[in-house]
A protein has these predicted regions:
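N-terminal export signals
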Residues: 2-4, 10-33
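Acidic (Asp/Glu)-rich catalytic clusters
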Residues: 39-46, 71-76, 94-114, 140-148, ...
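Non-membrane alpha-helical structural segments and their capping/turn regions in soluble enzymes
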Residues: 64, 68, 96, 100, ...
Length: 318
């Protein structure tokens, strides 16, 4: 029995062949063997590699796969853990039967479920106290869903308005309230640099200090440092990504390896991954790093695998 046969049998068992995951790219090279190598190598390494669901957003929005396929997709590509996006099961947060099916799919695939990235539930830094309270309340169902799935965190946004100091005060107030709620579930509330002042590392690290709660943390993203998306092509609309990650790492409970394009040597063209991973390692982080491929030059699966291979090469000194 060769690796190709093992891989195809595994894919059939996970119900992936009908979903298009049995492409030559993924299955032709012995994906199951690649998964075993990654899992074995990752166990003793300083970080392991997970897959953020947003990497496959084009396939999900197109209906080529659905949320329940995600765990199996990640398994075939060699990932040991997954990070969900609430948009892909927005109406299922309180559906215990559905969440249990997600648990079953993840268990069958042999992947861990790490966190849920939550959007569209209101601004935790809204100037209106009542609106902030509604936003906190809206996130409760995602805390419950994350608990049901065995996740360690939900990722939220710190959107606000006003002056620098006003936004820090408002965002920290909403986050602290949510952290107090999350404490009962044993879950963390982590904030990503995700536009506006949240993409300013100094501002967001200041928010963390103001919240001053053991359940709060950051999810530094290698690429999300645009302060004004309406001026995305202008240099001064961007915060220095290396400085930003360095400022956010002391509070990190997860890390996102954003990628868009690669050169002929497999290096990401917009981010110096060696430099970025050194910042992450020097901060003392020892956990999962999530691949989030957002480019258009490669198929979503191919881009995700390319990012994973780049992380492995640097991590393993290859």
């Amino acid at each position: 029995m060769n690796e190709q046969e093992i891989t195809r049998r595994e894919a059939v068992k996970l119900g992936l062949l009908g979903a298009g995951a049995a492409s030559g790219l993924l299955l032709g090279g012995g994906a199951l063997a690649e998964t075993r190598r990654a899992d074995a190598g990752g166990a003793g390494a300083w970080f392991r590699i997970s897959l953020a669901q947003w990497s496959l957003h084009k396939l999900l929005f197109a209906g080529e796969i659905d949320n329940l396929d995600f765990a199996g997709e990640a398994r075939v590509m060699g990932f040991g853990a997954i990070e969900y996006v609430n948009a892909f099961f927005k109406d299922k947060a309180e559906d215990i039967a559905y969440l249990n099916e997600m648990n079953k799919r993840a268990s069958d695939a042999g992947v861990e479920q790490l966190l849920i990235m939550c959007d569209g539930e209101g601004n935790l830094g809204d100037p209106s106290e009542s609106a902030r309270n509604v936003a906190v309340s809206n996130h409760k169902k995602w805390l419950e869903a994350a608990k049901q799935l065995g996740c360690h965190s939900i990722r939220v946004n710190a959107a606000s308005s006003g002056t620098w100091e006003e936004q820090q005060r408002l965002a920290s107030d909403g986050l602290r309230s949510l952290c107090e709620l999350a404490e009962a579930y044993g879950l963390n509330v982590i904030v990503e640099n995700h536009g506006g002042l949240s993409s300013n590392g100094k501002w967001l690290s200041g928010v963390m200090e103001l919240v001053d709660h053991p359940r709060v943390g950051t999810l530094p993203d290698f690429g999300n440092f645009c302060l004004d998306w309406s001026r995305v092509d202008e240099a001064d609309a961007w915060y220095d990504r290396y400085r930003g990650v360095e400022e956010l790492m002391p509070f990190a409970k997860a890390v996102s390896a954003k990628s868009h394009a690669f050169d002929d040597d497999g290096n990401e063209t917009g981010t110096d991954y060696e430099r970025m991973l050194k910042i992450v390692k020097d901060a003392g982080y020892r956990g999962w790093i999530g691949v989030e491929y957002e480019g258009g030059g490669l198929d979503p699966r191919a881009g995700s695998v390319a990012t994973k291979k780049l992380l492995e090469r640097i991590r393993d000194g290859g």
